[in-house]
C-alpha cells in the first residue's frame, strides 16, 4: 500500500507498507445505487447539484454518512441470515473484530489492492494506467461538462456526465470491478489516521480500533488534480457529501 515519497501528487498519509491477505474476500462490482439503498431506507434522496440530479435509481447513492453506509451493510447481512459486521459502541458503530462473514465496507487495504491490481506484483498508479493524460472515457471525473458546478476540470476531457453517472457505466479494471477511480469516492471501514505501522507486514488489517473520522477512497466526479486521481490517494471525513458513496464487501470464509 501507499506511494513512493517522490511520486508527484503524493500526500503525507500515503506511507508505503506491506499487507498480506490471508482471508479471501468478495467486493461489489459497482457502487451501491440509489435503488439498492432505498430498499433499506425508502425515504433517502441523494439530491441535485446545479440542475443535475443525483437521485436516479441507477446512479450511485450519495449524501450518506459513514454510519448510514455501515447500517446498510448490517441490514443486508440480516436479509441473508449473516452475522452483522458492525456493532454498537456508545453512539456509533464499530467493526466487529475478528470480522464476521457479514456484509461490510471494504477495508482501506482491500480497496487499494483491488483498485491498483495489475498482476505479476505490479500496482497501477491511475485507474487507466501509470501516466497522464487521462485516457478518454476511462472514468467519470471533473470534465468539461462539469465547468458550471466544479472549480477545476480536466482540460479537453469529456466523459459525458457533469455529475454522477449510472453505476457500471465505465470500463472494468483488471479484476472486473467498475468505478473504483471515478464517479463517486467511497467510504471504507477503517478509521482514519495519518501515520501507519511502517516496517511490519499487516495481515488482513481492519485499521485503528477507534477514531473520529473514516477513510474515503477514490476520485469522484468533482476531482481533476493529479493528487486525487491517483489510486493511492486517501481522503477522510464523517459527514455526508454529494460525491461520496460506497460499495459492499465481505469475507469468503
Give, region by region, the residue ranges found by the protein language model.
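A short glycine-rich, aromatic-capped structural motif
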Residues: 1-48, 60-77, 182, 248
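Structural motif
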Residues: 16, 24, 213, 226, ...
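Short, flexible turn/loop "capping" segments at secondary-structure junctions
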Residues: 17-20, 52-53, 159-160
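Functional-site microenvironments in short loops/helix caps that host divalent-cation chemistry
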Residues: 55, 66-234, 238
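A generic structural micro-feature
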Residues: 13-19, 210, 238-240
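Short coil/turn segments at secondary-structure junctions
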Residues: 52-60
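Short loop segments at secondary-structure junctions
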Residues: 4, 24, 131, 221, ...
Amino acid at each position: 500500500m501507499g506511494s513512493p515519497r517522490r511520486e508527484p501528487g503524493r500526500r503525507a498519509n500515503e506511507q508505503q507498507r506491506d499487507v498480506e491477505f490471508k482471508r479471501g474476500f468478495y467486493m461489489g462490482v459497482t457502487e451501491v445505487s440509489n435503488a439498492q439503498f432505498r430498499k433499506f431506507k425508502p425515504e433517502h434522496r441523494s439530491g441535485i447539484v446545479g440542475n443535475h440530479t443525483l437521485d436516479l435509481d441507477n446512479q450511485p447513492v450519495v449524501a450518506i454518512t459513514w454510519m448510514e453506509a455501515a447500517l446498510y451493510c448490517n441490514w443486508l447481512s440480516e436479509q441473508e441470515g449473516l452475522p452483522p459486521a458492525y456493532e454498537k459502541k456508545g453512539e456509533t458503530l464499530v467493526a466487529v473484530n475478528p470480522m464476521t462473514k457479514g456484509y461490510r465496507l471494504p477495508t482501506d487495504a482491500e480497496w487499494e489492492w483491488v483498485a491498483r491490481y495489475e498482476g505479476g506484483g505490479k500496482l497501477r498508479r491511475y485507474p487507466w494506467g501509470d501516466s497522464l493524460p487521462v485516457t478518454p472515457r476511462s472514468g467519470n471525473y471533473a470534465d468539461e461538462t462539469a465547468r458550471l458546478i466544479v472549480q477545476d476540470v480536466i482540460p479537453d476531457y469529456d466523459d459525458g456526465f457533469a455529475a454522477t453517472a449510472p453505476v457500471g457505466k465505465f470500463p472494468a479494471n483488471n479484476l472486473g470491478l467498475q468505478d473504483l477511480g471515478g464517479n463517486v469516492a467511497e467510504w471504507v471501514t477503517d478509521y482514519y489516521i495519518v501515520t501507519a505501522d511502517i516496517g511490519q507486514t499487516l495481515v488482513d488489517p481492519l485499521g485503528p480500533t477507534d477514531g473520529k473520522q473514516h477513510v474515503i477512497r477514490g476520485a469522484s466526479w468533482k476531482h481533476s488534480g493529479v493528487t486525487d486521481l491517483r489510486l493511492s490517494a486517501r481522503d477522510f471525513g464523517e459527514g455526508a457529501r454529494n460525491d461520496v458513496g460506497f460499495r459492499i464487501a465481505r469475507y469468503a470464509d
